[in-house]
């Protein structure tokens, strides 16, 4: 048998199977079951049979069989079946007293509970008849007699209780046997339980007592028996219902009367009790439509101090609404006011008429004929209320009773108007037919005696027919039904002379209202009646097509267009239906209008539909109109394109839709204008370009634009490929100067390119800010760095611009300045190194005092070597040049120069260097020894000079990141410094007090310094605590003195050298980690700062020459890939140290990326090869196991004479 025929796909471990298993035999081997197992099975089967016999015998009352079975299995007397029922449960369930006695004599447990928690006492109380009684009892009288005088139940209950059965056990629902007896009307059980002192006021889960359950489910005898047993009639269930609530709702006057006779006082009190639905027994009787019960309660209410009319509100309204006529009459006869007002000031007649309760309406009108036209707070009469629900019978009756048909409500609506609004077709038709008949009768009577007065009345009735009477807003019934689309009602009104051209206060016709509501059928019907309705406009000049388009009703729009509606009609805002649809964002309607020939744009309109769609952020509409060929770069009155509007209103998806078009470059052209003063200096204004807006709001879209600014001439694999970078939007420093619009001055405009055909600056190009620090601060590259947009800074276009600026100007200027500064600082160091300190000059006998050179003009013959005059000249020359450069920068950058602390350090270094090398006395000139204050100044100058070199190196991409780490650590330390100082002050003050005799702690100023030094490990423990006791400066004064000093020293070692120093190290590590995580961002940000600062320093020459700036830059990526030998090594060396002459930002990292990519791909291929090998091995193992499994299955099938036939199926 092949593995395909088996069709098995399983994973089994077959090693554990025994190939020669002797326990597996065929039928021929004649294997037999164990005799011990057969005996065990037979015993278990016999026990189960005995338990079944015991349960069955107890159920059937077969005492002999039960006794015989119990003799064989006495322990099965309490056996439970699947429902946890014992034989005692079944015997009690079917009223088998003899079986109950036998079971109890055999030690049956009377308190055992079944699955529902019922004991045998529960079961005996719950079920009334025995098993044999059910078939024998036929008539109802016999059933009542059996229920009342069932002696078996009493005997069973007494027997159970005599054997210590609990009298009030509760099941899982907290029901006692007495609850069951009351619920099932088991009188015998109830009587027996009460006699045995069962709790008549026990409560179940719903706080229902037996009396409450009896009122719901029981009989009069049960209730009477419970009342005799002093059951509490004031108990309330979980819904706060009393027995009076329940019997009132059920409508049992006998029960109610019985409880009233039992305790009249409590009955009266119960009338004032509310349940959780805020209902009294009186209200429940009304809601249950039980007039007899209601009359009993009303009789009791006469004795109640709290009158039911004051307590109960709108009872008559409820009865009138439901049509409970007898209940209504009973309430009225008991003193109820049938003209009572509810919360909306309506009388019961309103409610009855509304719900079409004709009998109630008739009764109320017959009693009070003057109330036929009574109104509620909305001014609605009973006739109007009947019309709202199309209660035709009541309408006919009220009209027959002379109800006023011309009366109006507070909104001046007639019954016909209200019926039209609620589409009460039959009622309105009846009213209109009635009015037509009445008008004809009036006409005939008037024509018989044609006086001037009667003729005037007839003509006025004709003119003001009911179907054309308007409401407060001048809407006719036709307006309302048209807006709701009630076609049959429209036809009915039109049949009776309704006007379709009448307008409301907004000058809207019924067609306008139908168009607003999108009622296509109503629109079609109105146009069939009068096509001229298309020409009518509302007070805002909107046609029906305008209104349908604004609401986005596509089908209605189609009907209007098919009937010849004007597609180019303009409303008071000079908007066409298409523009209105765009305002509302209705794409389907726009498509419908365009498909029908609506004009998308006009040459006279500055604002197109795209501007509107972009303002509201309707991306789908924008894309649709772009596909239709709308001009996307048209500008409105403010010079903004639709793209500008989308960006201003933060509609990112709309902006993306514009940028995905072929005309994206036209959208990126700025339209900002910066005025010039009389000196041709721009006023202080920020540039507002589309690209800057994208940088601020949508960086992802800015990256998309930057991608489009890179053009490649050929495929990536072509070695002759060239890449062109367009910097026009990224480097927007320059604008074109032209005459202002009013001709009185000049201005800078952004809509015209500042570059010529050769991509160089035009003659009239000018920076948009005279202070180039503003250009530096708000340059797009700087904005990217400040916002930490690494993906934008790392974009090839940004890197290309940085590389271009660095190679053309930044690199030569930076390295030239760095070289000159190195020459200066090295010369200053050499000069100081070869100059003797004023306190270190030897006079053949001793050293001179340093003040000697400050006080004497001439020097004695001293043996010292003067520094070479070359160093002095170099220092003076470079310092003077640098000071002039700083003055020039101050002139150019003005206040911005002063706020930069690096400029102050430069000025300090160069000025102090000049002062240091200057000879202020003849002694200094002849000996070269500086005066004391000069020497101190030289120390500060040399320190800040080298530190300044550190900050200059910080701007180098390769090494600057480490300086950034150091600066971040210093900043963190100074944030921690207040805590650090407090520890220093605490320990130094204590050491000053306890070790004041020692020189290092002798003053309050030296002690902090020594304490700080001790933090780095210079403790001098032996010198402090084990010095010469004979010397005052090393002596410890007594044991207490020594103990305090040791304790302080111990805490100092723990806190300052271990805890505090480790804390500082941890903070430093975190700072370094943070810088490393943003290393690429920091590097690019520093490069941006360096390049832009150099431009800011030299912008005067840049703008004069106009040769440096460009908007387009092309490279050949594969131009240097063929360099080998020394040329390749030299190129790599220059690239590593930022000296590469390459102008392509991608080439500098190409080798590294290729190496990383190759290494990564190699590793992935190796991992995949290993995985494939592992998979192949697993497949081989699975195949072997499957073959073995097939062999085993085949042997088993052969041994068991099983024929296996499997069909082959294609996977």
Swiss-Prot record:
Record keyword Ion transport present: yes
Gene Ontology cellular-component terms listed: neuronal cell body; non-motile cilium; plasma membrane
Sites carrying sugar chains: 856, 863
Pfam families xref list: Ank_2, Ion_trans
Extracellular topology ranges: 833-870, 916-932, 997-1004, 1026-1048
Keywords: ANK repeat, Cell membrane, Coiled coil, Glycoprotein, Ion channel, Ion transport, Membrane, Repeat, Sensory transduction, Transmembrane, Transmembrane helix, Transport
SMART domains on file: ANK
Cellular compartments annotated: Cell membrane
Assembly, per entry: Homotetramer.
Protein name: Transient receptor potential cation channel subfamily A member 1 homolog
Gene: trpa-1
